[in-house]
């Protein structure tokens, strides 16, 4: 796709900084670069140049790279200016670009959008790039690299090729059934592979829960009766003061949360109001919110300072959530606990039991040991399209007429195509590219 306008933006972080990167892309890139720096540098070679205004006043000096299209990030002529990252320097260069005819400031995600529309990236790679920029943990980085690097897209493309081959065999039987060189009932040979493909898609969908934990974090809720040590545990796990800790029961009235990194995974830790019956309006609202986050939890740490206080069933009706029973304040002489009465015996004051608790938390994280690639659907729209593809494959295997079989295989292929953006995704584009910052 050819664009008539040329866009520019600061692609690095906000100044001041040691270095700032300004990106330009579009048909007027070469002219804009020549007006700033003189003769064009060799393609894809970092060259030190003096950057000047239209009146030849010096703005700065820095490295300049020129990428003639289509061998560039966006697929069109593109350049990057690596200059000093002071506010005045960056502002002056952007003002100089703004004064040039045919140039305008880029919108959020517009460089990536041009890369997509010029066939340099597909939608899965674009989403992976957005996730890579936002990644805060090692597992988020690994998942994003798998997608932005094309590994996930290659999997879907392979499935699409198998569907295309199956359709070709069926349609060959439809169109050339009377020809001697077309074997009879050739379509029967492809159904074993179609069944295997459906199983592969189902297995892939089953891993979506792992991807959700990687992207959004494992939700761990600290629950228990008032004054059981919930806020102290939150502070100990966060290694800083998040919650107010007092000996007064009912100090925590609202749900507090903190994001942690545990064994490379993102963990969202919630501290909740003490669970008890009360007539106090504010505390009752806090308990209602506590029940709500317990219902959404992946794991509950149920705390008690007395063996008789481990009661969660009455606070989470209708849902079973994994629970770790944590005996707290065990540095005190009373009460005496039996080893069977709790899973972890903990004192946030002395640190006793913290290592065991952390080990138990890690045991609830997905086991990805030995997996160098993380091939799994990371977004709800991926899962929806995969389910549509799987359902179409089931219908194709149940159909008796060749025309219906071929049509269902076409629908399955279209569903896979919507994941990568090759089919009917125009309405999605604004949402996806809005996740990017300006300059990417």
Swiss-Prot record:
InterPro entries: G_TrmE, GTP-bd, GTP-bd_TrmE_N, GTPase_MnmE, MnmE_dom2, MnmE_helical, P-loop_NTPase, Small_GTP-bd. Mg(2+) binds at residues 231, 252. Keywords: Cytoplasm, GTP-binding, Hydrolase, Magnesium, Metal-binding, Nucleotide-binding, Potassium, tRNA processing. It comes from the Bacteria. GO terms for cellular component: cytoplasm. (6S)-5-formyl-5,6,7,8-tetrahydrofolate binds at residues 23, 80, 120, 440. GTP binds at residues 227-232, 246-252, 271-274. One of its GO terms (biological process) is tRNA methylation. The keyword Nucleotide-binding applies. K(+) binds at residues 227, 246, 248, 251. It is found in: Cytoplasm. The keyword Iron-sulfur does not apply. Its EC number is 3.6.-.-. SUPFAM superfamilies: P-loop containing nucleoside triphosphate hydrolases, TrmE connector domain. NCBIfam families: PRK05291.1-3, small_GTP. Homodimer. Heterotetramer of two MnmE and two MnmG subunits. Belongs to the TRAFAC class TrmE-Era-EngA-EngB-Septin-like GTPase superfamily. TrmE GTPase family. This is tRNA modification GTPase MnmE. The gene is mnmE.
